[in-house]
């Protein structure tokens, strides 16, 4: 899980979602692409 000021989808499978008011990227294809805005 990377925590960065701006989150962007890295590949075609990345999804941008909101959880508890936080913007996150989840990726079923490549778990390294997981990000959270912080």
UniProtKB/Swiss-Prot annotation:
Keyword list, A-Z: Ribonucleoprotein, Ribosomal protein
Taxonomic lineage: Bacteria, Bacillati, Bacillota, Bacilli, Lactobacillales
GO CC aspect terms: cytoplasm; ribonucleoprotein complex; ribosome
Family (UniProt): Belongs to the bacterial ribosomal protein bL36 family.
HAMAP family tied to this protein: Ribosomal_bL36 (MF_00251)
Species of the source: Lactococcus lactis subsp. cremoris (strain MG1363)
One Pfam entry name: Ribosomal_L36
Keyword Ribosomal protein (UniProt): yes
Biological-process GO terms, alphabetical: translation
Coiled coil: none
Protein name per the record: Large ribosomal subunit protein bL36
Protein's UniProt keywords contain tRNA processing: no
One GO MF term attached to the UniProt entry: structural constituent of ribosome
SUPFAM superfamilies noted in UniProt: Ribosomal protein L36
Domain of life: Bacteria
């Amino acid at each position: 899980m990377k925590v960065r000021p701006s989150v962007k989808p890295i590949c075609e499978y990345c999804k941008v979602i909101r959880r508890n008011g936080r913007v996150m990227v989840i990726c079923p294809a490549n778990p390294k692409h997981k990000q959270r805005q912080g």
